[in-house]
Design a protein with these regions (language model features):
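Pyridoxal 5′-phosphate
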Residues: 1-253
Length: 253
């Protein structure tokens, strides 16, 4: 039994099938001929599917190589605060001066000048994201716990496909429509001029399939079932292993 999927998750069958089918799409999404338009159509359908899974209808979904690149795109060059519990891809760009209490909760006095993860990969702590938060690492929560970008009230979020059973090397940055972002990779103007380079269509279609499958699992109650399994394991460890500490257990769903 595989106990930890925080680092990466096995490729979902739905993602594998979508990627194999995508190898038959030969056009470049930036081309205006028939093959290019077909590729562009597939790309935009995938974008809509991922937006739906994220509850981000009406927001901009910008494809990147993963959450690390997405974090650099939205956090780089900004004077934002974060906590030491964030992933290194976040702390590399921010001041880690936000306080963390004994339950793993983070205090954010100025949300518009801070970034805060929704879920922690090591402790499982879920944060209450304040309205107007500048950005959030949604990677560990996406596909595992129910949420919708639109009701989180944040300005931007980022995710990676491989955390929920999609392929490695593909992710997305989600921002409120019209948000100004300075491209860090410049060239052909892809992704609305925010991230140049021909889109990884095979990876993107695999990402969309995995995101849709993960959302279907959530709709069928997988999060509640996993919480029951987790609680059962914790009780067994506490009863049979002597003194056991579970950091942040008060802050999990």
């Amino acid at each position: 039994m595989r106990m930890v999927l925080s680092s990466t998750a096995p490729l979902r069958p739905e993602a594998r099938a979508a990627m194999i089918e995508a190898t038959g799409i030969t056009g470049n999404p930036s081309s205006v001929h028939a093959e290019g338009r077909a590729a562009k159509s597939a790309l935009e359908r995938a974008r809509e599917e991922i937006a739906t899974a994220l509850g981000a209808e009406g927001a901009d979904v910008i494809f990147t190589s993963g959450a690390t690149e997405s974090a650099a795109l939205i956090l780089g060059g900004r004077d934002l605060a974060c906590a030491a519990v964030e992933h290194a891809a976040v702390t590399a760009w921010c001041r880690d001066d936000l306080a963390v209490d004994a339950t793993g909760r983070v205090s954010v006095p100025e949300p518009g000048r801070a970034t805060l993860q929704l879920a922690n990969a090591e402790t499982g702590v879920l944060q209450d994201l304040p309205q107007g938060l500048a950005a959030s690492d949604l990677t560990q929560a996406f596909g595992k716990v129910p949420f919708a970008f639109n009701w989180l009230g944040i300005q931007a979020g980022f995710v990676s496909a491989h955390k929920l059973g999609g392929p490695r090397g593909i992710g997305a940055l989600i921002v409120r429509r019209g948000t100004e972002i300075e491209a860090r990779i410049k060239g052909g103007g892809q992704e609305q001029g925010r991230r140049a380079g021909t889109e990884n269509l095979i990876g993107i279609l695999g990402f969309a399939a995995a995101a849709t499958a993960a959302q279907n699992d959530l709709d069928q109650g997988i999060a509640e079932k996993m919480s029951e399994i987790r609680d059962s394991i914790m009780l067994r460890l506490e009863s049979g292993a002597g003194m056991v500490t579970f950091p942040g257990r008060e802050s999990r769903s």
